[in-house]
Amino acid sequence: MKNGRTYFAISSVIFLVVLAISPLKDFFREWKWYQYEYNDLVGGLPQRIKPADIGIKQIWARKLDRIDRCVTCHLGLKEKALVESKEPFRSHPQIYHDFEELGCTICHEG
């Protein structure tokens, strides 16, 4: 009987530790750090650029039946003030189509 209680106690503690750690996976997602870094970058610029809302961003290219989530990290695509910034925050060079309509992977292949 005592042996069964020991196993139950150990498995309960392990379960609680796993349950407590699980929400941390979302907190430490790589894309969040890119968004925090972007917000720090635009906060230090003389131009007024709206900081990014923290979260997954996507472009739904309906005509191509494709969803691109590149803009979750590549946040400065439209910002002319970021033309000299490092990747992934650099603004995109002039293109002849609206990337919000066609997305990124159609040209960049993923």
Could you say what each language-model-derived stretch is?
Residues 1-110:
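Short sequence/structural segments immediately N-terminal
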